[in-house]
Amino acid sequence: EKERMKELVRKLNEAAKAYYQEDREIMSNLEYDTLYEELQALEEKTGVTLAGSPTTKVGYEAMDELPKEAHESPMLSLDKTKDVEVMRSFIGDHKTLLSWKMDGLTVVLTYHGGTLVKAVTRGNGIIGEVVTNNAKVFENIPLKIPYQGELILRGEAIIRYSDFEKINEEIEDVDAKYKNPRNLCSGSVRQLNNEITAKRHVHFMAFSLVSAPGQDFGNSRIRQMEWLKEQGFEVVEYKVVTRDSLDEAMKYFSEKIETNDFPSDGLVALYDDIAYGESLGTTAKFPRNAFAFKWADEQKETTLLEIEWSPSRTGLINPVAVFEPVELEGTSVSRASVHNIS
């Protein structure tokens, strides 16, 4: 089991490095989540967490090409589930905001004296990359706002499917086309030349207000979101729910996902009561005032071509299924680890 854990840590970290540092995907979200959950289960079973395990750290180191900067408050990942009942028990009797979990690149904006002064990517949650010049050419970001204090907010930079398709149509080389809007967005936001960013039609969807001294929001996240709209920001669409109205809201979101022009990979539940949510604190990795819901894994039928036996670094021989390529979450998949031949 320890050897399998070492192998999982290595594979997951390689995938994270490729994704966060090199803007490329070497495994699909689905495969990453499956391996991650296997590692979590083994860690729980053995009581051991290896150094470097992705279950105890977030993201990867930012690259050196753009200036780096530490976030004023660390950006933790969200705990997540695919089970609606887990979401229901999290929500309980609390008034909760249920919103899209946007699938792009998280960016933190700072305004001073009504002017955008800084934009920093999420990076590894502790240190991000400064992309202020690029943020200034996002399609819908307000460069000036009425509020004159120091405003810090978080949101997701995204590229809409319609824009993604137009950009891909202009690329003649099939191999050079982008696999999905998230990859294109990540590369666009982290450009060294913001003229390129400007051509990519990046949108910013605000999802969290970090601080706005002097403003009274009546201890309500809803009031914060409405205030951000008044300042000129486009905010992520949300519904206010309790456990009793959760099913109706889930139905609304699940039906709308089919026609959305923006990429999302689930939903986020956040308590409206700011003081209560903050009083819960955090675990080593997750805040306790929010929870993410992931849609059921995308499934595709394909044809198994052969089974290969792949020796791991530890000497174990693992079966690998080779099949006709299928698109899963925007990534072409043609191989997958299997547990046994039967």
Q: Residue ranges of each PLM-predicted region?
A:
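RNA/tRNA-interacting regions in translation and RNA-turnover enzymes
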Residues: 1-342
